[in-house]
């Protein structure tokens, strides 16, 4: 952790010092990447990473995307320039198509096998990964270095301060909670098949920051397939259904899970979803922490106005004047009204 903090501090200092015409950057896997100039035409092969570029005010630099309007309607509404971007089929771009579009940097998720072909095409390729708050902040600073504008630098630092402030505000209310007062939360990423998010993930981080305990903490990693019998053994106090996973009532497990504590006490929640699902790997995790804290400890966060917080975030970091009704739909995990 100390090493990560030192690296983040070094990144922050380099950002405030200005951006050189050419630079050698270090991606999230520790690989050195040469950039001849600040990126102006970016391909993004990691679904979640788009929200980082948008937070930096650089969403309009994305000229190739793995996201699609049908899957991420809020993303394309808030950042309409994505409609003109090259849209990948699946997770893979043609290197030739990227070169033809003049792409000068591409972000890929860690362990993406296509990174090899992008590098062979001489496209600066940065492998990105974060699984907690500290590494998210580091990734944002690295992304700002790639963009290389004073605005991106300022916004990266501003977002990181904002995230720290939200965490501090929530922690002030939850720090005194005993272990017994922290509900056991099961986060279900998929109902068909049944997949959950466990420890050593960003999901586990926001559960704990919001004053909960991960019911699946004995398992590590994202989107782990489990048996319904294991869920019954865990018997969580709260179940959070990930955006796009459907409803528990309409799932094959409705009857089987009817005896769970969370179901009997009506504490099965649908997660909000905006530019990206709040519960996953994007900058809206700052809002997710607030939302989760209010769901887990409503009395302690009775005065927290989630609609106001959501609207303020979208205006500040996405430059989008979100209406009240739009914020309500995002909080309910609903897409924008078409038309």
Describe the role of every protein-language-model region.
Residues 1-9:
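Bacterial N-terminal signal peptides that target proteins for export
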Residues 28, 84-96, 219-228:
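Short helix-initiation/N-cap motifs at beta->coil->alpha
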Residues 44-101, 105-111:
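A short, structured surface patch at a secondary-structure boundary
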Residues 196-222:
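Alpha-helical, coiled-coil/dimerization segments enriched in small aliphatic residues
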């Amino acid at each position: 952790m100390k090493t990560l903090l030192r690296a983040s501090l070094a990144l922050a200092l380099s950002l405030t010092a200005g951006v050189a015409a050419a630079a050698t950057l270090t991606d999230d896997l520790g690989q050195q990447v040469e950039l001849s100039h600040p990126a102006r035409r970016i391909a993004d092969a990691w679904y979640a990473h788009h929200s980082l570029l948008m937070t930096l005010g650089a969403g309009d630099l994305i000229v190739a995307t793995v996201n699609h309007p049908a899957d991420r309607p809020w993303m394309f509404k808030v950042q309409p320039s994505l409609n003109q971007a090259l849209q990948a089929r699946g997770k893979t771009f043609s290197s030739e198509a990227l070169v033809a579009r003049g792409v000068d940097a591409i972000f890929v998720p860690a362990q993406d096998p296509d990174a090899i072909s992008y590098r062979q095409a001489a496209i600066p390729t940065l492998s990105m990964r974060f699984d907690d708050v500290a590494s998210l902040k580091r990734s944002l600073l690295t992304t700002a270095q790639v963009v290389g504008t004073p605005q991106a630098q300022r916004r990266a630092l501003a977002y990181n301060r904002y995230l720290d402030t939200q965490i501090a505000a929530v922690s002030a209310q939850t720090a005194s909670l005993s272990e017994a007062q922290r509900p056991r939360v099961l986060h279900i990423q998929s109902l068909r098949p049944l997949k959950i998010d466990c420890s050593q993930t960003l999901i586990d981080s926001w559960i704990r920051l919001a004053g909960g305990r991960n019911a699946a903490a004995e398992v590590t990693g994202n989107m782990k397939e489990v048996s319904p019998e294991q869920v019954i053994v865990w018997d969580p106090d709260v179940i959070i259904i990930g955006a796009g996973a459907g409803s528990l009532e309409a799932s094959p497990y409705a009857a089987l899970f009817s005896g769970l504590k969370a179901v009997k006490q009506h504490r099965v929640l649908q997660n909000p979803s905006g530019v990206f699902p709040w519960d996953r790997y994007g900058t809206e995790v700052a809002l997710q922490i607030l939302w989760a804290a209010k769901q887990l400890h409503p009395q302690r966060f009775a005065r927290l106005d989630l609609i106001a917080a959501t609207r303020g975030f979208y205006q500040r970091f996405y430059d989008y004047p979100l209406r009240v009704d739009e914020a309500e739909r995002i909080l309910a995990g609903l897409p924008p009204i078409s038309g």
